[in-house]
């Protein structure tokens, strides 16, 4: 493989001049079978770097730092992604550290609470700027361990207004969380009505995300056989990696998102670590570490379709997508391709009722063949091509505002992993068409030799256990029948200090739970919390599971055989 140094082509590594354009041009000129070397230094990317149509290409850092642009106070449209990778094959990024040129959030501690006026004061750590122009997209509080505790948790509606700044120039101010600067690194914040300020204590840790969604360090579409190895992300504006259709076979080795030692930041990324929307083949993650994320460490799913109309005689099916307000939207043009098998599920039960093969797909219209079963408008659709197999091995997730791993696929093995301090379940296996329109149901899942500690600890109807298998992401589970999921095995896992029971499984046909250990797994004030709940399940086996509560029912069965 030919080796080329970026320094030989005028790419600067002083962290000052933007190298995005020059780097993009160099990459476009590279032949196949090339290793592009980034010698030690900082490479400033103020615009996305395109990597289009390349084969057998490796990007190797040699002590290199990738620094993308982020401003806590300017228009977010000027913030930057890192690399946009499209239609590539056999690609590798390895041995890089990544950060931003500005902080992605700020953090501090509560110094005063005014219940009558619904305000609270926060002393922001001196390492963060406090000018009054910083835009707070959302608020999160954390306990002493840095685990998001939802005492205050907001996603804020952003307003824009044109004001005059201290130089006399006009400037757009973005406001989500309303606050006032009342002293040196001291702010007064008005709390929304839904927040119970009586739970907020002096010294409570608070962070404000300057943005939540919108920027990705590594973005992929139409790529095959990609590896990201030994990547250390210290600051990421939104997501570390996003994988969009139609991608196939991704490996993450030592892909880490965490703040550097000594940092006052509570989040290293404002949203997901890795977000996957339609992957074929396999996903492999080994020795990855995530600490302090604004959302899930991993969410793998595909876009749910819905049948709007069907003409069986002509073999024509019109398919749509629904947004969070349940409004009809067009499906992605990459949602299906010729030869794909589409699974059809009944909307209210999520039980599979048929399938068809795509002969042609355009603008949501499918010309279908091999139609099996009876379809109707409202039925849910999942493309079987996007049920990538998943292998997570020796991965660790700590202190995420949501789940550790949200898994919506088939043939999954999760082993030797550790999850700590997730507000919601450490692992959730579930599709969702109540809010998110994500699929799909799982089959053939093994979770073994993992440790779950301090998961699902906030008061929420979504916190049913450290490992949850059901049919919607948030509240609600008991009205889905057995058979949504199939063949789940959990063995030799340890559950400690869980804010609910350890395991909650619903709507599953084929459950085997062996040798799982439970210590201090109970809801606050409910010492008889069952350690395992099996709801609407069939063909279940539970043996040699052990709890520290001898007087507590270890397994609770609800409509389960």
Regions found by a protein language model. Name each.
Residues 10-11, 20-27, 32-58, 62-77, ...:
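N-terminal extracellular ligand-recognition/capping segment immediately after the signal peptide
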Residues 1-7, 12-19:
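Mature N-terminal, pre-catalytic/accessory segment of carbohydrate-active enzymes
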Residues 46-48, 68-73, 102-106, 215-216, ...:
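Short glycine/acidic-rich loop motifs that flank beta-strands on beta-rich extracellular proteins
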Residues 29, 47, 67-234, 259-267, ...:
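Extracellular polysaccharide-degrading/modifying enzymes targeting complex plant/algal/animal polysaccharides
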Residues 442-468, 472, 479:
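Eukaryotic tandem repeat interaction scaffolds
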Residues 246-282, 310-328, 418-456, 518-544:
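Long amphipathic alpha-helical scaffold regions
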Residues 31, 54-55, 61, 83, ...:
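Parallel beta-helix/beta-solenoid
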């Amino acid at each position: 493989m030919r080796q080329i140094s970026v320094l030989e082509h005028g790419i600067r590594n002083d962290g000052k001049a933007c190298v995005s354009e020059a780097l993009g041009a160099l990459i476009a000129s590279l032949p196949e079978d090339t290793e592009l070397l980034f010698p030690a230094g900082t490479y400033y990317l103020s615009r996305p770097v395109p990597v289009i149509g390349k084969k057998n290409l490796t990007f190797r850092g040699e002590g290199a730092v990738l620094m993308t642009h982020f401003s806590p106070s300017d228009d977010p449209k000027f913030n930057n992604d890192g690399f946009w990778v499209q239609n590539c094959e056999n690609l590798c990024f390895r041995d890089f550290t990544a950060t931003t040129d500005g902080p992605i959030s700020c953090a501090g501690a509560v110094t005063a609470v005014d219940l009558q006026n619904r305000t609270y004061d926060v002393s922001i750590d001196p390492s963060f700027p406090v000018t009054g122009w910083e835009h707070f997209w959302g608020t999160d509080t954390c306990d002493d361990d840095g685990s998001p505790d939802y005492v205050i948790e907001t996603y804020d509606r952003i307003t824009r207004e044109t004001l005059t700044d201290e130089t006399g120039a006009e400037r757009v101010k973005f406001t989500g969380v309303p606050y006032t600067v009342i002293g040196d690194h001291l702010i007064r914040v008005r709390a929304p009505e839904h927040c119970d300020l009586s739970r907020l204590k002096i010294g409570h840790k608070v962070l404000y995300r300057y943005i939540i969604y919108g920027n990705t360090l590594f973005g992929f579409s139409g790529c095959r056989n990609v590896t990201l190895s030994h990547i250390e992300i210290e600051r990421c504006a939104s997501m570390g990696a996003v994988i969009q259709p139609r991608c196939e076979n991704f490996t993450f080795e030592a892909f880490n998102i965490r703040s550097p030692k000594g940092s006052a930041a509570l989040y290293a990324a404002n949203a997901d670590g890795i977000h996957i929307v339609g992957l074929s083949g396999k996903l492999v993650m080994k020795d990855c570490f995530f600490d302090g994320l604004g959302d899930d460490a991993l969410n793998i799913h595909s876009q749910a379709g819905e049948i709007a109309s069907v003409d069986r005689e002509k073999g024509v099916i019109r398919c749509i997508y629904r947004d969070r307000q349940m409004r009809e939207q067009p499906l992605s043009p990459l949602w299906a391709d010729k030869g794909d098998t589409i699974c059809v599920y009944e909307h209210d039960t999520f039980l599979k009722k048929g399938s068809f093969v795509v002969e042609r797909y355009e603008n949501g219209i499918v010309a279908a063949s091999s139609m099996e079963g009876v379809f109707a408008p409202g039925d849910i659709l999942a493309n079987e091509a996007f049920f990538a197999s998943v292998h997570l091995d020796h991965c660790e997730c700590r202190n995420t505002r949501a789940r550790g791993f949200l898994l919506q696929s088939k043939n999954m093995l999760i082993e030797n992993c550790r999850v700590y301090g997730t507000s919601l379940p450490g692992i959730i296996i579930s599709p969702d068409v109540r809010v998110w329109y994500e699929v799909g149901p799982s089959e053939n899942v093994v979770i073994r030799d993992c440790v779950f500690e301090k998961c699902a600890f906030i008061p929420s109807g979504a916190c049913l256990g450290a490992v949850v298998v059901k049919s919607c992401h948030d509240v609600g589970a008991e009205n889905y029948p057995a058979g949504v999921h199939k063949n789940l095995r959990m063995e030799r896992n340890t559950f400690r200090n869980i804010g609910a029971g350890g395991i909650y499984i619903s709507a599953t046909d084929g459950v085997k739970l062996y040798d799982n250990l439970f210590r201090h797994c109970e809801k606050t004030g409910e010492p008889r919390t069952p350690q395992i709940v099996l709801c609407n399940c069939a063909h279940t086996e539970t043996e040699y599971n052990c709890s520290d509560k001898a007087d507590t029912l270890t397994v609770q069965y609800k409509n389960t055989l």
